[in-house]
Amino acid sequence: MENTLPVKEEQKHVKISEFVLYLVAVFFYTNMTGMMGSYRNDYLVNVLQIPSTKLSLYNLLISVIPFVINFFIAMYIDGRKMGKAGKFRPLALIAAVPMGILLVLSFVTPKAFTGTILMIYLVTVAVAWSIASNFGGTTNMVAVVMTPNLKERDTVMSFRGIVSAVGNSAPLVIVLVIGIFAKDKGTRFIIGAALCSVVGIIAMLLGMKAVHERVAYTAEKRNPLVGFKDVLGNKYAWTIIISEFLKSFRGIATYMGVFMAGALLGDTDKFVLFGLPTGIGTAVGMLAINFLLKKFNSKVLYIASGIYSVIINIIAFIVGYTYFHNPSKVLQIIFIAFLFLIGLQFGASNLLPSMFQADVLEDIELKTGKRLDATFPFVIGIGTMISGTIASTLAPRILYDDPTTGWKSIIGYMPGLVDDTAQSLDSKVKLLFFYTVVHGIMMFLAGVPFFFYKLTGKTKEDIHNAVVEQRKKFEEG
C-alpha cells in the first residue's frame, strides 16, 4: 500500500428526510424479525406442541441448511457491482415482499399436516424465511455506506441500533393488544404476523427507495473465495469472530425468555412485560454508550459491559428466586425493573459489535481494496452458527420432557397449561437461572477477547482517513 497523507472526511451527506425514512425502514424490518424471534418458539411449543426432541432436530436443520445457502448469498452480495441504485438497496427492496409473506406463513400451519409432512413444511418455511431475511438484512448494511464521514457513519449506526431495539420489542405490544379481543393464542400470532408483515413491507419499500449509498470502492471483479481468506487473515477480525461465537451461547438464555414470562406472570403473551423494560433499557443503554464513547474507547466499554452483565443478572436471579419462594407484587415489580437494568447492557452488546465490524471492514478494505460487507458477517456467522446451533438444539431439551422418547429435561417445563404459574417451583427456579445467570456469564465471556483488540482511538482514525483517500482514487479512476 503506497503512503498517502490522510485526509479527514468532514462533510455531512445524509439529509434529515433520508435519515428518518431509513430509520423507519429499519424499525419495521426489525419489527418483522422481532415477531419471529419473540413468538416462533412459543408457537411451536404451546400451539403446535412439537415434542422437544423433534424441536431440537428442527432447530438443527434450520441452523445448518440456511448457513450453507448463506455461504453463496454472501459471495453473491460482495460480488455485486455498485450500480446507480447502489449495492445493497436493490436487494432490500426485492426482499421486502417475500419476508412479509413468509412471516405470516411461519404462524400458519395446515391442520392436515402431521408427522414428517409437518416437519418438512415447518423447515421449508423457516429456511425460506432465513434466505429472505438474509437479503433483507442488507437494510442494516446500508448504514455503513450511506456516508464516508466517520462521525456521521457512527451516528447513523447508533440510531439504527436504537431503532432496531425498539422495533424488535414492538411485536410484544402488538400481540398483547390483539389478545384483548382474540383469545386463541394461534389466532393472535397470525394477526400479529399479518400486521407486522403489511406495515413492514411498506416501510422497507419507502425507506430503501429514499436512501443513497455514497461510499465508493473498486468494482474490479475478483475471486469471491479470496474474500474469506482476507477476513481470516485479519487479526482484528478474529477478536470479533471469537467474541460472537461465545456470545451466541446466550441463545439458551433468550430461548427461555417467553416461558420465563409465563412462569412469572401466568401467560407467555405477557412477555411484553419482559420485552418492553429490556427494550427500553437497551435504547437507553445505546444512548449512554454514545455519550460514554466521548470519554472512553469502545473496547473498554464492551469489556465493562460484560462485567456489568454478570453482576446485574446474578442480582436479578436473587430477586427472582426470593419472589418464587415468597411471592409478592413488590418483588415481582422489582424483578421486572431489573430487566431494564439488564437491558442497559444490551445497549453495548447490540451497538458496539456493529461498530467494531465497520472498523474491521475498513482495515480489510485498506489492505486489500475490497469491501467485504457480506463476507465478513458470514465468516463471523460460521462461529455463531456452530454455537447458536448447539444452543438452539439444546434449549428445547433443557426446557421440557418428551414422553414419546422418554427424554427427561433439566427444567421440566409443562407445555399447554392455561396458567403457567402452575409450573413447579423447581422448574421456575431453573428457568430463572438459565434466563439470567447463564446470559450474564455468556456476555462476560464475549468481552474477554477484546482485551487483545487494538483497533481503537488513533489507530482507528488513521485507518479511516487512509481509506477515504483510497476511495477518492477509485472515484477518480
Model-predicted segments: where are they?
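Membrane-embedded alpha-helical bundles of multi-pass transporters/translocases
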Residues: 2-477
